[in-house]
């Protein structure tokens, strides 16, 4: 009986606290209605703004389901399941997901406070009974009271709830074992680079082909020489690329070489003199086959003319024909080239002689080694590991030391003996 009275008192105390909390919440414009104590229903039963087009169908959807213990609604979804990469198909009656309040307390009856507004269509409304008929009214009231105490009063109203964007593009969300969306969306990063490289190479190759097609590699005509002389007089010796634009099929390098080697007014075209050959020999001894440098020191002779004169003289040096009247005797340049050739032959023959000497020295070393080996075999023998030594009489044992009447004891008598008595007494 005492326990019954205590329980009634505890129930009245909880009812008074619950009433004060409801009044305070009403003053703070809490969005939920105050629960009437006479009606054994949940305080969430008046949420009648649910769109009937977004009701959860327990039989149509296939997938994982979770029951809400407080709202008594069985929620199912075909998109969210245990398989993280399961194909997520689009359906017309698919509901949006909204932010939820985290778990308020470790109680098995309420897990989250969910927003009951689904922003799809607000044309038709249908009231859903959120109370299970089998639930105890007292348990529901206690749960409501405990949850209302846990919810902060500054909790944002229903209108400020923002939907969470769970919608992902089909290329990302549709990833499964039978779907190749990931393979389709993953592109090769090097593909643009390869494209640019191929395009640049193709463009460069096409440019080279057009350049080669327009380039003329034949001999210069008299008309081209005349035009080139006029252009050089007009533009000078610097603007070869500009001059080449006037001459179709020619480039600046061709124009410059044609001018300096053939069309220059101060070029000497007569036969080389002995004095010029002497100067050429001196500079060749100094700097070698640098024809451009030699041309700077030989006025009137171009790089091309100096090289041609050198090669022609070398060919005459090895020619078996008789000397013509034009060249009655070998020139100074021919003698110089001949001396160079002889020096080259001598230099090439020196290594051969050196190799012969080395081979002869090796042969001598082999002969000496064979002779030394023969001597060792004669001294030590062929089958003996230890060499056979021959001793002379000087190293023999003197047998006269042990004649008759002599013994080893007689030999030891001559050895002085220490004073044992003095050693014992410490003297």
From Swiss-Prot:
SMART domains: SANT (SM00717). Residues 240-263, 291-314 bind DNA. Expressed at high levels in the synergid cells of the female gametophyte, and at lower levels in the endosperm of young seeds and the trichomes of young leaves and sepals. Transmembrane segments: none annotated. This is Transcription factor MYB98. Disruption phenotype: Impaired in pollen tube attraction associated with a reduced cytoplasmic calcium burst during pollen tube tips growing. Altered expression of several ovule-specific genes. Pfam families: Myb_DNA-bind_6. The lineage of its organism: Eukaryota, Viridiplantae, Streptophyta, Embryophyta, Tracheophyta. The gene is MYB98. Transcription factor that binds to the motif 5'-GTAACNT-3' in the promoter of target genes (e.g. DD11 and DD18) and promotes their expression within synergid cells (e.g. in the filiform apparatus) in ovules. Required for the formation of the filiform apparatus during synergid cell differentiation in the female gametophyte. Involved in pollen tube guidance to the micropyle. A motif (Nuclear localization signal 2) lies at residues 361-368. One of its GO terms (cellular component) is nucleus. Keywords: DNA-binding, Nucleus, Repeat, Transcription, Transcription regulation. It is found in: Nucleus.
């Amino acid at each position: 009986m005492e326990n019954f009275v205590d329980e009634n008192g505890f129930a009245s105390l909880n009812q008074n606290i619950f009433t004060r909390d409801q009044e305070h919440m009403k003053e703070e414009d809490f969005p939920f209605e105050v629960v009437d104590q006479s009606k054994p229903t949940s305080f969430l039963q008046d949420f009648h703004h649910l769109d009937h087009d977004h009701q959860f169908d327990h039989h149509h959807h296939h997938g994982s389901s979770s029951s809400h213990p407080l709202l008594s609604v069985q929620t199912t979804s075909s998109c969210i399941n245990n398989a993280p990469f399961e194909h997520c198909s689009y359906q017309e009656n698919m509901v949006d997901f909204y932010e939820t309040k985290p778990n308020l307390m470790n109680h098995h009856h309420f897990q989250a406070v969910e927003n009951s507004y689904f922003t799809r269509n607000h044309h038709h409304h249908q009231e859903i009974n959120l109370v299970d008929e089998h639930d105890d009214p007292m348990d529901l009231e206690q749960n409501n009271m405990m949850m209302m105490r846990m919810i902060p009063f500054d909790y944002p109203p229903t209108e400020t709830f923002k939907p969470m964007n769970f919608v992902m593009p089909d290329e990302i969300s549709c990833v499964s074992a039978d779907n190749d969306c990931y393979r389709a969306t993953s592109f090769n990063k090097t593909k643009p680079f390869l494209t640019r490289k191929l395009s640049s190479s193709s463009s460069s190759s096409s440019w080279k082909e057009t350049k080669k097609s327009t380039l003329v590699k034949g001999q210069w005509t008299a008309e081209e020489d005349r035009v080139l002389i006029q252009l050089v007089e007009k533009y000078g010796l610097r603007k070869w690329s500009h001059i080449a634009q006037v001459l179709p099929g020619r480039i600046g390098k061709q124009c410059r070489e044609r001018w300096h080697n053939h069309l220059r007014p101060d070029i000497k075209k007569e036969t080389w003199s002995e004095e010029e050959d002497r100067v050429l020999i001196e500079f060749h001894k100094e700097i070698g086959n640098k024809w451009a440098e030699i041309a700077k020191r030989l006025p009137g002779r171009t790089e091309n003319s100096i090289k041609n004169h050198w090669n022609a003289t070398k060919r005459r040096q090895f020619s078996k024909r008789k000397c013509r009247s034009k060249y009655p005797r070998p020139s100074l340049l021919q003698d110089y080239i001949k001396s160079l050739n002889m020096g080259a032959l001598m230099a090439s023959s020196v290594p051969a002689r050196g190799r012969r000497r080395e081979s002869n020295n090796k042969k001598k070393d082999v002969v000496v080694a064979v002779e030394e080996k023969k001597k060792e075999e004669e001294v030590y023998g062929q089958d003996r590991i230890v060499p056979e030594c021959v001793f002379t009489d000087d190293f023999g044992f003197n047998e006269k030391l042990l004649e008759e009447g002599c013994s080893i004891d007689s030999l030891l008598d001559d050895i002085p003996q220490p004073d044992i008595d003095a050693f014992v007494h410490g003297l």
